[in-house]
């Protein structure tokens, strides 16, 4: 399974890339706004750090605006993926962009039916929001499982990005059902490294080594 970072923070992205476990990045207007830099400047800087898919979201909600923004964003770097909201205009835009060879990521997916429509339009990726679905007292990972089954049934090549990840268990469950990608906040990536027994083991090794060196 591929792991993307869901952030626009350059320091977090650099650290994840240095660890060797980050395959791509997803951003959205909220994440970009937190960094206090111009939109395109931030996207370009991310492209310089990550050699993999980088999702940049359109702001327009009308069809023509989405197409114009998408074409301009796609010129920034060959790794740019255009993030499009799951709306009728969005799906219409995905159909046009896919024919032009522009990669797309349909976001704000909350049902298998939405994912089916996105795949039929030619989306490169879909992003089901598992955390937000969980908030509604539903099983977010069940929706991912159903989406993947539909894609397998009909041979869709659209990849599933598990989004709105809240904790490492979401990543584990996504991996167990065979999701293509999980996009995670940096805080979740950090937690994936940790286990109390690992810390205890390291502490014991260090104590034993110190005793060995001092002959005690």
UniProtKB/Swiss-Prot annotation:
<dbReference type="Pfam" id="PF00923">
    <property type="entry name" value="TAL_FSA"/>
</dbReference>
<dbReference type="InterPro" id="IPR001585">
    <property type="entry name" value="TAL/FSA"/>
</dbReference>
<dbReference type="GO" id="GO:0006098">
    <property type="term" value="P:pentose-phosphate shunt"/>
</dbReference>
<dbReference type="InterPro" id="IPR004731">
    <property type="entry name" value="Transaldolase_3B/F6P_aldolase"/>
</dbReference>
<dbReference type="InterPro" id="IPR013785">
    <property type="entry name" value="Aldolase_TIM"/>
</dbReference>
<keyword id="KW-0808">Transferase</keyword>
<keyword id="KW-0570">Pentose shunt</keyword>
<dbReference type="InterPro" id="IPR022999">
    <property type="entry name" value="Transaldolase_3B"/>
</dbReference>
<dbReference type="InterPro" id="IPR018225">
    <property type="entry name" value="Transaldolase_AS"/>
</dbReference>
<dbReference type="GO" id="GO:0005737">
    <property type="term" value="C:cytoplasm"/>
</dbReference>
<keyword id="KW-0963">Cytoplasm</keyword>
<dbReference type="InterPro" id="IPR033919">
    <property type="entry name" value="TSA/FSA_arc/bac"/>
</dbReference>
<comment type="similarity">
    <text>Belongs to the transaldolase family. Type 3B subfamily.</text>
</comment>
<dbReference type="GO" id="GO:0004801">
    <property type="term" value="F:transaldolase activity"/>
</dbReference>
<dbReference type="GO" id="GO:0016832">
    <property type="term" value="F:aldehyde-lyase activity"/>
</dbReference>
<feature type="active site" description="Schiff-base intermediate with substrate">
    <location>
        <position position="83"/>
    </location>
</feature>
<protein>
    <recommendedName>
        <fullName>Probable transaldolase</fullName>
        <ecNumber>2.2.1.2</ecNumber>
    </recommendedName>
</protein>
<dbReference type="GO" id="GO:0005975">
    <property type="term" value="P:carbohydrate metabolic process"/>
</dbReference>
<comment type="pathway">
    <text>Carbohydrate degradation; pentose phosphate pathway; D-glyceraldehyde 3-phosphate and beta-D-fructose 6-phosphate from D-ribose 5-phosphate and D-xylulose 5-phosphate (non-oxidative stage): step 2/3.</text>
</comment>
<keyword id="KW-0704">Schiff base</keyword>
<comment type="function">
    <text>Transaldolase is important for the balance of metabolites in the pentose-phosphate pathway.</text>
</comment>
């Amino acid at each position: 399974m591929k792991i993307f970072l869901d952030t626009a923070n350059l320091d977090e992205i650099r650290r994840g890339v240095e660890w060797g476990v980050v395959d791509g990045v997803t951003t959205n207007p909220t994440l970009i706004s937190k960094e206090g830099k111009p939109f395109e400047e931030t996207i370009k800087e991310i492209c310089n750090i990550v050699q993999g898919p980088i999702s940049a979201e359109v702001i327009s909600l009308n069809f023509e605006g989405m197409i114009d923004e998408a074409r301009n964003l796609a010129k920034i770097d060959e790794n740019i993926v255009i993030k499009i909201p799951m709306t009728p205009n969005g799906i219409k835009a995905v159909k046009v962009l896919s024919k032009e060879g522009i990669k797309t990521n349909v976001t704000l997916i909350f049902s298998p039916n939405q994912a089916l429509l996105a795949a039929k339009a030619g989306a490169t990726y879909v992003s089901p929001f598992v955390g937000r679905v969980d908030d509604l007292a539903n099983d977010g990972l069940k929706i991912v499982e159903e989406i993947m089954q539909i894609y397998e049934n009909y041979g869709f090549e659209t990849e599933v990005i598990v989004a709105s990840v809240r904790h490492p268990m979401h990543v584990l469950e996504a991996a167990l059902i065979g999701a293509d990608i999980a996009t995670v906040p940096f805080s979740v990536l950090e937690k994936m490294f940790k286990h109390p027994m690992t810390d205890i083991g390291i502490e014991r090794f260090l104590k034993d080594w110190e005793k060995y060196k001092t002959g005690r």
